[in-house]
Amino acid sequence: MPRKLSVTLLLLTASALAQTTAPAPVPAAQPSAEHRPAASGAVNPDLYYRPAPDAMPQDGVPRGETRGPYTLPSQAYPGTQHTYWVYVPAQYDPAAPASLMIYNDGQAFMAPEGDVRAQFVMDNLIYRREIPVMIAVFINPGRRPDQPEPTLRNWGDRDTNRPAEYNTLDDRYARVIVDELLPVLYKEYNISKDPERHGIGGSSSGAIAAFTVAWQRPDQFRKVLSNVGSFTNLRGGDAYPDIIRKSESKPIRVFLVDGRNDNRALSPDGSYDQRRDWFYQNVRMEQALTEKGYDVNYSWGIGRHGQKMLQTVFPEMLRWLWRDHGVSTDPHDTVEQSVNAGKTNQ
């Protein structure tokens, strides 16, 4: 049976930590229209979520290096290019194959002033050996050279190739990741080619894109991190539960996160479109995956559409997705992973 997160426990823990040890949270940037939640009463449910302690640099923990930006011209989407950054942990050893994690909407996952701050989380979890040593790639949606780079305030829904790449249920974005990005990474870094050691994740449209990559290419990616996934009828994403039920099971592990105050497709006139209800469709995804015997976990909270809830549960998502990585039982092997002490925080 998959282990389900206790949202109540997470909220209480996050609240207590925020009052005792965690620095005040960085105010979030305003989302674009596609990410802006509908009003849901006087109380903002996102206020109950705080950055996890592991989203902060910790004393004594060596920091990884985030390299880039780099530009990746696309053959799958001619005339466009993808900007990406590569996170290399302090513990990376070129002689030992590392695991791999890809983050769609990379700027939103790596921004130091953002909600997730994935590079700090990975610094801390790798140091404590709660996840394997892994290279991470923060990749933005494709755009033409004359279009602006996505930012925390503008994820690119109106002025990049994001809607076509992320929401369409075909294999073209998987080709960007597998056929265009991976060969570049393999040339530069010693990354394991075992698909069990490859993960991909994202938020909103970036989450359904992550699932599509693993669905199309389970020979390359078998771990999916999905936050407020757009499994809705933007471009047919609400069909996935039925597709899952009708298809042979694939060796994919999935962690889904969403909140009851996500976009619920309620119009001012009282009409309701179930196919565009984010929370409902995420629950449908979990049910379909469970019925087919997938390794699936989920956390249903009260958050809106965005990354506020994710900032609390993100470390646990990584731990769960990578829970079966190798563990040393040598009684003399008790020191945290600190290969490069020169990068320890000051």
Name these PLM-found stretches:
Residues 10:
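Short coil/turn motifs at helix boundaries and re-entrant loops, enriched in small/polar
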